[in-house]
Design a protein with these regions (language model features):
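Structural beta-sheet core signal
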Residues: 16, 38, 65-68
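Switch II (G3) loop of P-loop NTPases
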Residues: 7-26
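Beta-strand-loop-alpha "switch" segments that mediate conformational coupling across diverse proteins
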Residues: 81-116
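Conserved C-terminal guanine-recognition region of P-loop GTPase G domains, centered on the G4
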Residues: 47-69
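Conserved nucleotide-binding/hydrolysis micro-motifs of P-loop NTPases
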Residues: 71-74, 101-102
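Inter-motif core of Ras-like GTPase G domains
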Residues: 21-44
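Inter-lobe coupling/hinge region of RecA-like P-loop helicase motors
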Residues: 104-134
């Protein structure tokens, strides 16, 4: 069973989610990580927070992936593409459309792949999400960063 500790341990093949908050040891974890994934929602405030976070950590670890997430329509996607491409050319960007897969993963205790592969309907319904999700996994698996 996992335990909450005062400091964060360095664990291989692990994803840390700090929920937007700094915890003791975060910078050490970032320094030792192959990749740092920074989420960005389709609004100006989130874009500013993303910029602040990148500014704070890019000298510690430049292997940053921006996860542009929760966009609901073409206008929000275009907002993300325009602003992220214009301001963060040197980083990889993955786009996750707003999807029920997040809620379903939590509610049913299943992984994204388990939900995607449940049946033909879910494969079709999650098709676009699956494409970007697997693209993210390939980046994480096939490259160790720079």
């Amino acid at each position: 069973m996992a335990k909450i500790r005062e400091t964060v341990a360095d664990i291989d093949n692990c994803v840390f989610d700090f929920g937007g908050f700094s915890a003791h040891g975060v910078l050490n974890i970032i320094k030792e990580s192959n990749w740092v994934i920074i989420p960005c929602l389709p609004d100006f405030n989130s874009l500013l927070r993303t910029a602040e976070t990148i500014k704070e950590i890019k000298e510690i670890n430049k292997n940053i992936i921006i996860l542009a997430t929760d966009y609901k329509d073409q206008n929000e996607l275009e907002f993300l593409i325009t602003n992220l491409t214009e301001n963060f050319k040197e980083f990889k960007v993955i786009y996750f459309r707003n999807s029920k897969i997040f809620k379903n993963a939590i509610n049913f205790g299943k992984s994204f792949d388990e939900l995607i592969n449940e049946n033909a309907i879910s494969q079709n319904g999650y098709k676009n999400f699956a494409k970007e999700y697997h693209r993210l996994l390939e980046i994480l698996k096939t490259t160790q960063g720079e």
